[in-house]
């Protein structure tokens, strides 16, 4: 299993990805992880990752606690299926992509800047791996 994090658009602050990169580097001990900023008109995630599970962050998505998020990662590991995560841009997700997602997930009922959502998602991925392996980070 490999984890891909895609973000639509670039952050305003060039240092905004540092925290997300740190958590993904830590998660990389358990599974290869890749993070990239994209433009929807230049990539088709279904062609690039035909068998991967597409999990997109959306305010109207399914609320999920950390234990359920870890279970989702575990399922991906057991199936050997890549996980593709996407955080939309300032205008949200492209409607056609939103409709095709395998799962829409909400990080919170609150609204956060996209830069913070990147860090929060990366941290939850790392936390999920730590939960599955009883790593002391989760305590």
From Swiss-Prot:
Subcellular location: Cytoplasm
Its biological purpose: Specifically methylates the pseudouridine at position 1915 (m3Psi1915) in 23S rRNA.
Family in the record: Belongs to the RNA methyltransferase RlmH family.
Protein name: Ribosomal RNA large subunit methyltransferase H
Binding site residues for S-adenosyl-L-methionine: 57, 88, 107-112
InterPro entries xrefs: Alpha/beta_knot_MTases (IPR029028), RlmH-like (IPR003742), tRNA_m1G_MTases_N (IPR029026)
Gene Ontology MF term list: rRNA (pseudouridine-N3-)-methyltransferase activity
